[in-house]
C-alpha cells in the first residue's frame, strides 16, 4: 500500500511540529520550506489536520501552527485513517462484474486493517523523541 502525498506530507508536518519544543509555534511557510512542498497543498493538509484536532492554528501577528495535542497521544494509524482514502479497489457493480462473488475486497480490507493496527503501535513521540539525526535534518534545536 502506498500512501498519497497528502498523507505523506501530513505526517511529515506533524513530525516537524512534534520535533519542536512543546507548544512552540511554527508557520506553514516554515513547514513547506523544510519539505519543499507547495504552500497551497500544505494549507489544505493543515486545514484537515486542524479540523481533526491534530493541529492548532492561531491567527494574527504572533500566530502560527503547533500540535493540537501531545505527541505521545497522536497515533500514526489514526492520522492515516484521517487523511488517507483507504479503499484499495473499486468494487462498485457498475465497474466490476464479479463483485457479487469476489472475495478480494475482504482480503484487502483485512490487510489494510493489519497495516493500520501496526501503525497504531506508534505515536508521534515514538518517531521524534531523542532522534538527534532527525532534529539536525529538520534544523530543529
UniProtKB/Swiss-Prot annotation:
One of its GO terms (molecular function) is DNA-binding transcription factor activity. One of its GO terms (biological process) is negative regulation of DNA-templated transcription. PROSITE patterns: HTH_RRF2_1 (PS01332), HTH_RRF2_2 (PS51197). Residues 28-51 bind DNA. The keyword Phosphoprotein does not apply. Keywords: 2Fe-2S, DNA-binding, Iron, Iron-sulfur, Metal-binding, Repressor, Transcription, Transcription regulation. Its cofactor is [2Fe-2S] cluster. GO terms for cellular component: cytosol. Binds 1 [2Fe-2S] cluster per subunit. It comes from the Bacteria. InterPro entries: TR_Rrf2-type_CS, Tscrpt_reg_Rrf2, Tscrpt_rep_HTH_NsrR, WH-like_DNA-bd_sf, WH_DNA-bd_sf. [2Fe-2S] cluster binds at residues 91, 96, 102. The keyword Metal-binding applies. Residues 2-129 form the HTH rrf2-type domain. Nitric oxide-sensitive repressor of genes involved in protecting the cell against nitrosative stress. May require iron for activity. This is HTH-type transcriptional repressor NsrR.
Amino acid at each position: 500500500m502506498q500512501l498519497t502525498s497528502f498523507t505523506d506530507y501530513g505526517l511529515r508536518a506533524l513530525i516537524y511540529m512534534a520535533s519542536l519544543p512543546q507548544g512552540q509555534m511554527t508557520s506553514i511557510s516554515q513547514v513547506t520550506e523544510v519539505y519543499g512542498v507547495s504552500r497551497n497543498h500544505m494549507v489544505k493538509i493543515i486545514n484537515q489536520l486542524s479540523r481533526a484536532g491534530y493541529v492548532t492554528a492561531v491567527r494574527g501577528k504572533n500566530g502560527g501552527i503547533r500540535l493540537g495535542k501531545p505527541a505521545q497521544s497522536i497515533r500514526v494509524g489514526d492520522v492515516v485513517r484521517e487523511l488517507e482514502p483507504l479503499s484499495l479497489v473499486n468494487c462498485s457493480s457498475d465497474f466490476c462484474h464479479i463483485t457479487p462473488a469476489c472475495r478480494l475486497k475482504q482480503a484487502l480490507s483485512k490487510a489494510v486493517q493489519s497495516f493500520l493496527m501496526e501503525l497504531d503501535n506508534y505515536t508521534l513521540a515514538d518517531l521524534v523523541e531523542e532522534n538527534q539525526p532527525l532534529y539536525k535534518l529538520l534544523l530543529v534545536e
